[in-house]
Regions:
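Short S/T/G/P-rich N-terminal loop/turn motif that feeds into the first structured element of a domain
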Residues: 1-56, 65-69, 94-106
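Short amphipathic alpha-helices in soluble, non-transmembrane regions
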Residues: 70-78
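Glycine-centered loop/turn motif at secondary-structure junctions
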Residues: 43, 78-81
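Short hydrophobic/aromatic beta-strand micro-patches
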Residues: 61-63
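Conserved short beta-strand edge segments in small beta-sheet-based binding/regulatory domains
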Residues: 80-92
Length: 106
């Protein structure tokens, strides 16, 4: 089965930051504890995780069979309690260029 890559952007308001909000900190700690097991159960792998300083934003990069696996993990680990998110399917730039070059221009 083909493994795809997905970029996830997560963000929250400053008042929801685990830095200052005790409930969010508890959720963040729980998230980091359970994430490896949830990913393993779906055959997923995290290949990147970055905080965008000084914003309240993070970028996660996953390898997964389908976008639904990524979505479900985000819900099950609790990110949706304190973060908003966007999930982006990705295409390697050389593949995108080849595809785009084959399209008829306007």
């Amino acid at each position: 089965m083909k493994i795809n890559q997905y970029v996830v952007e997560l963000w929250h308001e400053p008042g929801m930051s685990p830095l200052s909000n005790a409930a969010s900190r508890k959720m963040a700690n729980h998230t980091h504890e359970v994430l490896p097991g949830l990913m393993e159960a779906r055959g997923m792998k995290m290949i990147g995780a970055y905080h965008l300083d000084p914003e309240h934003r993070s970028i996660l990069i996953f390898e997964a069979k389908c976008v639904e696996d990524v979505r479900d993990v985000l819900y099950e680990i609790g990110f949706m309690h304190w973060c908003d998110d966007r999930i982006f399917p990705t295409t390697p730039l050389p593949e995108m260029h080849k595809w785009a070059a084959a399209q008829e221009p306007i």
